[in-house]
A protein has these predicted regions:
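Extracellular "complement/coagulation-type" protease architecture
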Residues: 2-294
Length: 294
């Protein structure tokens, strides 16, 4: 209760300093991450499951977005989270044989916490195929704040080591000069098992989209509490991450290799095709935290 009171005091101070309504700050930051399991993860999981089952009986393709081929994103993890109210879905990134990076709100969304999760690797479908491991070993960032949606990062430890193959591989972390790069102007690739468009559409398979990385100053025009520890992508041309992609990777090519620069955190409550930016946890801001847990 004391922590909640302090959080609201901090929100009030921020609102006063920027001459905006407190309700506006809270409303912006409680968009797609706060209470994620009940609002998004659990309802979406059942729709994805049904889409996969129907795909087994039909040759229909995905409407909107681009489907991934098996092995195209070998570092992509699918997460099936068992929460108190039901089963939800998220994404993650395989860093080494026993560590998967995801968003904190995929495990604890400010209202409910997961009990266990199935980590799915080497599959373009989340409810079937691939390597599947059950774990509850999740380290959430100690300063994760579900109201501000800050420090939205968590590390999953797998119960046993996974072997690499053509379909399973690790994503590199930024290093050297890349640690000082904000990546604005880069074209990044986001991938996930979430919705392919607003209005209830889901896919039966992994999807991906290329997105321009924008400056935090531009992003802050939409999300006023964007921090330096966030990285954002443009939502122009109705292209963005969407509900269910939470925790998944944002990747760029640098020095001839793919590196992880973001963990999918939140988008705008009004939808994924309205031109609003998407926000991610900036990997370079958490590189020490990540390396300590590898």
């Amino acid at each position: 209760m004391k922590l909640l009171a302090l959080t609201f005091l901090a929100l009030a101070a921020l609102a006063s300093a920027r001459n905006i309504n407190l309700e506006d700050v809270i409303d912006l930051e409680m968009i797609t991450a706060y209470d994620y399991h009940n609002k998004i993860g659990i309802p979406l999981a059942e729709k994805i499951r049904k889409a996969e089952e129907e795909a087994e009986l039909s040759s229909s393709r995905i409407v909107g977005g681009s489907s991934a081929s098996l092995g195209q994103f070998p570092y992509q993890a699918g997460l099936i989270i068992e929460a108190p109210a039901g089963t939800g879905v998220c994404g993650g990134s395989l860093l080494n044989s026993r560590r998967v990076l995801t968003a904190a709100h995929c495990w604890h969304d400010g209202i409910s916490q997961g009990r266990s999760m199935t980590v799915v690797l080497g599959s373009i479908r989340i409810f079937s195929g691939g390597i599947r491991m059950v774990t509850s070993n999740v380290a959430v960032h100690a300063n994760w704040n579900a109201l501000f949606i800050t420090n939205d990062i968590a590390m999953i430890t797998l119960p046993s080591a996974v072997s690499t193959s053509s379909n399973v591989g690790f994503i590199a972390l930024p290093s050297g000069n890349e640690l000082n790069n904000d990546f604005a102007g880069f074209t990044a690739t986001a991938s996930g098992f979430g919705r392919t468009r607003d209005g209830g559409a889901v896919s039966d398979t992994l999807n991906h989209v290329n997105l321009p990385v924008i400056t935090n100053a531009v992003c802050r025009n939409t999300f006023i509490t964007i921090q330096s520890s966030n990285v954002c992508t443009s939502g122009a041309n109705a292209r963005s991450t969407c509900q269910g992609d939470s925790g998944g990777p944002l990747v760029v090519t640098s020095n001839g290799r793919r590196i992880l620069i973001g963990v999918t955190s939140f988008g705008h409550r009004d939808g994924c095709q309205r031109g609003f930016p998407a926000a991610f946890a900036r990997v370079t801001s958490f590189i020490s935290w990540i390396n300590q847990r590898l």
